[in-house]
């Protein structure tokens, strides 16, 4: 029985980063898929701490909130930096990822048709901080922080991949980010995950946008 269970909708959404992390680290996990119809029946929602998914189980530990789950896996699997300085920088990166993901989710679920063009125009300004951070770490040839992969890398990689679907070419003016995505996506276990039917056949969002 896998030690980890992901309870979530049949989409990539807020779980694909943790799935990539688990796959890359050679961990097995179980998926409990909650259909929209099941969720709309209203019986599961009151049992969830914040009334939302994902729900994550690590043995007898149950967690909610996707970033809390990522940080837990980071601590558990040695993906949280070598010291407090690196850990603090990883937290900063991850919060930056969450800021942009929040903007993306708002676009997808509330204003896709009318807001996409303005969103894409503003996107370079939101991507630039990550390019800057890469440039400050080993010339952008390694990870976002330090010399070992971290939970923040998986979250950033997922964010960049979904934006490449939304706006192909969005990284063309960011050579370090472009190389970073290619480099991480080529890690054998991530490459296998990204080409797996489970990933390929899972839509990014739950409303047919992307």
Curated annotation (Swiss-Prot):
Keyword Metal-binding appears in the UniProt entry: no
Reactions accelerated catalytically: RX + glutathione = an S-substituted glutathione + a halide anion + H(+); prostaglandin J2 + glutathione = prostaglandin J2-S-(R)-glutathione; prostaglandin J2 + glutathione = prostaglandin J2-S-(S)-glutathione; prostaglandin A2 + glutathione = prostaglandin A2-S-(S)-glutathione
PROSITE patterns with a match to the protein in the record: GST_CTER, GST_NTER
Sites of N6-acetyllysine modification: 128
E.C. number: 2.5.1.18
Chain segments annotated as coiled-coil in the UniProt record: none
Tissue: Ubiquitously expressed.
GO BP field: animal organ regeneration; cellular response to cell-matrix adhesion; cellular response to epidermal growth factor stimulus; cellular response to glucocorticoid stimulus; cellular response to insulin stimulus; cellular response to lipopolysaccharide; common myeloid progenitor cell proliferation; glutathione derivative biosynthetic process
Localization terms from the record: Cytoplasm; Mitochondrion; Nucleus
Class of the enzyme per the UniProt entry, highest EC level: transferase
Keywords per UniProt: Acetylation, Cytoplasm, Lipid metabolism, Mitochondrion, Nucleus, Phosphoprotein, Transferase
One term under GO cellular component: cytosol
Database matches in InterPro entries: Glutathione-S-Trfase_C-like, Glutathione-S-Trfase_C_sf, Glutathione_S-Trfase_N, GST_C, GST_pi, GST_superfamily, Thioredoxin-like_sf
Phosphotyrosine modifications at: 4
Annotated glutathione binding sites: 8, 14, 39, 45, 52-53, 65-66
Entry-linked Gene3D superfamilies: 1.20.1050.10, Glutaredoxin
Annotated GST N-terminal domain residues: 2-81
Pfam families: GST_C_3, GST_N
Assembly information from the UniProt record: Homodimer. Interacts with CDK5.
Function: Conjugation of reduced glutathione to a wide number of exogenous and endogenous hydrophobic electrophiles. Involved in the formation of glutathione conjugates of both prostaglandin A2 (PGA2) and prostaglandin J2 (PGJ2). Participates in the formation of novel hepoxilin regioisomers. Negatively regulates CDK5 activity via p25/p35 translocation to prevent neurodegeneration.
Family: Belongs to the GST superfamily. Pi family.
Protein name according to UniProt: Glutathione S-transferase P 1
């Amino acid at each position: 029985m896998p030690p980890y269970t992901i309870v979530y909708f049949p989409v990539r959404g807020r779980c694909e980063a943790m799935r990539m992390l688990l796959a890359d680290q050679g961990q097995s996990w179980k998926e409990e898929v909650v259909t929209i119809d099941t969720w709309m029946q209203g019986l599961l929602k009151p049992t969830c701490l914040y009334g939302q998914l994902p729900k994550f189980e690590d043995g007898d530990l149950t967690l909610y909130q996707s970033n809390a789950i990522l940080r837990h896996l980071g601590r558990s699997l040695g993906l949280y930096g070598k010291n407090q300085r690196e850990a603090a920088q990883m937290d900063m990166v991850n919060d930056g990822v969450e800021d942009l993901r929040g903007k993306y989710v708002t676009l997808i679920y509330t204003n896709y048709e009318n807001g996409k063009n303005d969103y894409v125009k503003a996107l370079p300004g939101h991507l630039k901080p990550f390019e800057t951070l890469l440039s400050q770490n080993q010339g952008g040839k390694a990870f976002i922080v330090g010399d070992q992969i971290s939970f923040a890398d998986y979250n950033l990689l997922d964010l960049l991949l979904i934006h490449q679907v939304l706006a192909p070419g969005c990284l063309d003016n960011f050579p370090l980010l472009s190389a970073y995505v290619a480099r991480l996506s080529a890690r054998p276990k991530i490459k296998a995950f990204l080409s797996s039917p489970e990933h390929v056949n899972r839509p990014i969002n739950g409303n047919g946008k992307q």
